From Swiss-Prot:
This is Small ribosomal subunit protein uS12c. Signal peptide: none annotated. Part of the 30S ribosomal subunit. The keyword Plastid applies.
Length: 123
Protein backbone atom coordinates (compact mmCIF):
# COMPACT_ATOMS: atom_id res chain seq x y z
CA UNK A 1 0.00 0.00 0.00
CA UNK A 2 1.67 3.23 -1.11
CA UNK A 3 1.70 6.37 0.98
CA UNK A 4 -0.04 9.51 -0.28
CA UNK A 5 3.38 11.07 -0.84
CA UNK A 6 4.40 8.15 -3.07
CA UNK A 7 1.16 8.54 -5.06
CA UNK A 8 1.82 12.28 -5.45
CA UNK A 9 5.31 11.53 -6.72
CA UNK A 10 4.07 9.09 -9.37
CA UNK A 11 0.43 8.29 -10.03
CA UNK A 12 -0.84 4.77 -10.55
CA UNK A 13 -0.48 3.51 -14.12
CA UNK A 14 -3.68 2.69 -15.96
CA UNK A 15 -4.00 -0.82 -17.32
CA UNK A 16 -4.40 -0.46 -21.09
CA UNK A 17 -7.17 -2.53 -22.70
CA UNK A 18 -5.90 -4.69 -25.55
CA UNK A 19 -8.18 -4.64 -28.60
CA UNK A 20 -9.59 -7.93 -29.88
CA UNK A 21 -9.53 -6.78 -33.51
CA UNK A 22 -6.36 -4.74 -34.11
CA UNK A 23 -6.49 -4.97 -37.91
CA UNK A 24 -9.62 -2.79 -38.02
CA UNK A 25 -7.66 0.12 -36.47
CA UNK A 26 -10.58 1.32 -34.29
CA UNK A 27 -13.03 1.32 -37.23
CA UNK A 28 -16.34 -0.61 -37.15
CA UNK A 29 -15.60 -2.29 -40.50
CA UNK A 30 -12.85 -2.37 -43.10
CA UNK A 31 -12.84 -3.11 -46.82
CA UNK A 32 -10.51 -5.77 -48.16
CA UNK A 33 -9.68 -8.04 -51.07
CA UNK A 34 -9.84 -11.84 -50.78
CA UNK A 35 -6.47 -13.42 -51.46
CA UNK A 36 -7.55 -17.00 -50.78
CA UNK A 37 -10.93 -18.67 -50.14
CA UNK A 38 -10.81 -22.11 -48.52
CA UNK A 39 -12.28 -24.41 -45.84
CA UNK A 40 -10.81 -25.39 -42.48
CA UNK A 41 -11.74 -27.85 -39.76
CA UNK A 42 -12.72 -26.68 -36.24
CA UNK A 43 -11.16 -27.54 -32.88
CA UNK A 44 -11.54 -30.85 -31.03
CA UNK A 45 -15.17 -31.61 -30.04
CA UNK A 46 -16.62 -30.14 -33.27
CA UNK A 47 -16.45 -31.44 -36.82
CA UNK A 48 -17.23 -29.50 -40.01
CA UNK A 49 -15.74 -27.75 -43.03
CA UNK A 50 -15.88 -24.07 -42.12
CA UNK A 51 -15.64 -21.56 -44.98
CA UNK A 52 -12.97 -18.90 -44.42
CA UNK A 53 -11.13 -16.35 -46.54
CA UNK A 54 -7.74 -14.73 -46.30
CA UNK A 55 -8.37 -10.99 -46.74
CA UNK A 56 -5.92 -8.14 -47.38
CA UNK A 57 -7.43 -5.08 -45.67
CA UNK A 58 -7.09 -1.40 -46.59
CA UNK A 59 -5.29 -0.95 -43.26
CA UNK A 60 -2.46 -3.11 -44.66
CA UNK A 61 -3.17 -6.19 -42.53
CA UNK A 62 -3.81 -9.65 -43.95
CA UNK A 63 -6.38 -11.47 -41.80
CA UNK A 64 -8.42 -14.67 -41.84
CA UNK A 65 -12.16 -13.92 -41.91
CA UNK A 66 -15.11 -16.28 -41.51
CA UNK A 67 -17.80 -16.45 -44.22
CA UNK A 68 -21.14 -16.91 -42.39
CA UNK A 69 -24.28 -18.53 -43.80
CA UNK A 70 -24.97 -21.44 -46.14
CA UNK A 71 -23.28 -21.07 -49.54
CA UNK A 72 -21.30 -18.07 -50.82
CA UNK A 73 -20.12 -16.50 -54.08
CA UNK A 74 -16.68 -15.35 -52.93
CA UNK A 75 -13.50 -16.11 -54.83
CA UNK A 76 -10.02 -14.66 -55.16
CA UNK A 77 -10.01 -10.87 -55.82
CA UNK A 78 -13.55 -10.44 -54.41
CA UNK A 79 -13.91 -7.11 -52.56
CA UNK A 80 -15.50 -7.67 -49.13
CA UNK A 81 -16.40 -5.77 -45.97
CA UNK A 82 -14.86 -7.20 -42.78
CA UNK A 83 -16.18 -6.70 -39.25
CA UNK A 84 -14.83 -7.87 -35.90
CA UNK A 85 -16.06 -10.99 -34.12
CA UNK A 86 -14.22 -14.23 -33.60
CA UNK A 87 -15.24 -17.81 -34.33
CA UNK A 88 -14.78 -19.79 -31.12
CA UNK A 89 -13.86 -23.15 -32.66
CA UNK A 90 -11.52 -21.79 -35.36
CA UNK A 91 -8.17 -20.70 -33.89
CA UNK A 92 -6.84 -17.49 -35.45
CA UNK A 93 -10.15 -16.43 -37.03
CA UNK A 94 -11.05 -13.11 -35.35
CA UNK A 95 -13.07 -11.43 -38.10
CA UNK A 96 -16.33 -11.95 -40.00
CA UNK A 97 -17.20 -11.04 -43.58
CA UNK A 98 -20.37 -8.91 -43.86
CA UNK A 99 -22.87 -10.61 -46.19
CA UNK A 100 -24.90 -8.59 -48.70
CA UNK A 101 -22.35 -5.77 -49.19
CA UNK A 102 -19.79 -5.13 -51.98
CA UNK A 103 -19.01 -8.43 -53.80
CA UNK A 104 -20.48 -10.67 -51.07
CA UNK A 105 -24.06 -11.68 -51.92
CA UNK A 106 -26.71 -12.38 -49.28
CA UNK A 107 -27.64 -15.92 -48.26
CA UNK A 108 -30.13 -17.54 -50.64
CA UNK A 109 -33.64 -18.50 -49.40
CA UNK A 110 -33.04 -17.04 -45.94
CA UNK A 111 -36.25 -16.00 -44.15
CA UNK A 112 -35.22 -15.68 -40.49
CA UNK A 113 -32.41 -13.49 -39.06
CA UNK A 114 -32.24 -11.87 -42.51
CA UNK A 115 -30.42 -8.71 -41.41
CA UNK A 116 -27.42 -10.75 -40.26
CA UNK A 117 -27.07 -12.38 -43.68
CA UNK A 118 -27.80 -9.45 -46.01
CA UNK A 119 -31.17 -10.64 -47.30
CA UNK A 120 -33.92 -8.25 -48.39
CA UNK A 121 -37.51 -8.77 -47.20
CA UNK A 122 -39.34 -11.22 -49.49
CA UNK A 123 -42.41 -9.84 -51.28
Amino acid sequence: MPTIQQLVRSARTRLSKKTKSPALKSCPQRRGVCTRVYTTTPKKPNSALRKVARVRLTSGFEVTAYIPGIGHNLQEHSVVLVRGGRVKDLPGVRYHIVRGTLDSAGVKDRSQSRSKYGVKRPK
